[in-house]
Each structure stands twice: as C-alpha cells, then as structure tokens.
Amino acid sequence: MKQTSFFIPLLGTLLLYGCAGTSTEFECNATTSDTCMTMEQANEKAKKLERSSEAKPVAASLPRLAEGNFRTMPVQTVTATTPSGSRPAVTAHPEQKLLAPRPLFTAAREVKTVVPVSSVTPVTPPRPLRTGEQTAALWIAPYIDNQDVYHQPSSVFFVIKPSAWGKPRIN
C-alpha cells in the first residue's frame, strides 16, 4: 500500500512533465505558402484587404467551373432502329389456310348469379384539407473561386407556395 501511494504521484508527475512545453508560445509549422502570425496580425491583414477593395471585382464575374462530369441525370442513349428494307416480309401462301379459334374447354359450367347487397355507406364528418407546400430546386454547379477553393455541387430548395388549410372535403 505504501509503495503504491508513492508511485502514483511519481507517475502523475512524469506524465505531466511529458506534456509540458519548453516554450511559452505555440510553435509555428509554416509551409512554403503560409506564414506564421499572431491573431492580431491576422486581423490587421484582413482589415487591410477589406479596406483596399471597396467594390468587389469578383462579384461582377462568374467563377470558373471545375473540371469533370457532374451530371445528375444519366445520359439518354438513342437506340437505332433497323431500316424497313431489312425486315423480313410476311407473305401468305395461297395453299395455307388459317384455322378458326376453338375453345380449349367445352364442359358444361354452372352459372351462378350474384345479387348485390345494398349497403348504406356511413356518413363521416368533413375532414380538413391540408395542401402541401410547393418547392423548387436550384442546382449549383461545382466551381473554383478566386482563392483557388473548390466548392462542391449542391442544391438549394425554395418554397414557392407555402402549405395551407383548404376547405373541408366530404367523403
């Protein structure tokens, strides 16, 4: 028991020592296209870019489309029909006779008459009628913006006519 109580704080100290960093600030692992900066420097850089471009020139031009086949519907193939000259012609020979159709089963059958049962349909109270909303979909093609960011194809749905309660119907 005494040995266990000694090793637990020692083990905890060793674990915390491994997590402790040698510097007070985080190190920057910048790649060739990135630079390290503090949050204040990044905010200042963003403010400068925002001030310099009062009118956004990108909004006037369309972004370039991404490469690839992004069809949502399969390509409809056209089937070729054979010309009428290649079809075999049907010829009737004068010596061939067509047979009249004959019944397959000639046994006597019992005919039953069915008398319909008159029934009164129960009257149900009128039910309220709810019409569903009508929506339209807008497909947005994939594109790459001016900062070379790829945007995937997506769909945006709009409500054209909202749902509403109609006059009750009687069944």
Curated annotation (Swiss-Prot):
Classify the source by domain of life: Bacteria
Task: Note the lipidated residues of kind N-palmitoyl cysteine.
Answer: 19
Keyword flag Lipoprotein: yes
Topology versus the membrane: Lipid-anchor
Q: Where is the lipid attached (S-diacylglycerol cysteine)?
A: 19
Tell me where in or outside the cell this protein is found. Cell outer membrane
Asked if rRNA-binding is a keyword of the record, the answer is no
Signal peptide range: 1-18
Q: State where it is primarily located.
A: membrane
Q: Which InterPro entries does this entry report, sorted A to Z?
A: T4SS_TraV
Disulfide linkage: none
Query: What's its job?
Result: Involved in F pilus assembly. Appears to facilitate the polymerization of inner membrane-located pilin subunits into extracellular F pilus filaments.
This chain belongs to the protein called: Protein TraV
Query: Organism source for this protein?
Result: Escherichia coli (strain K12)
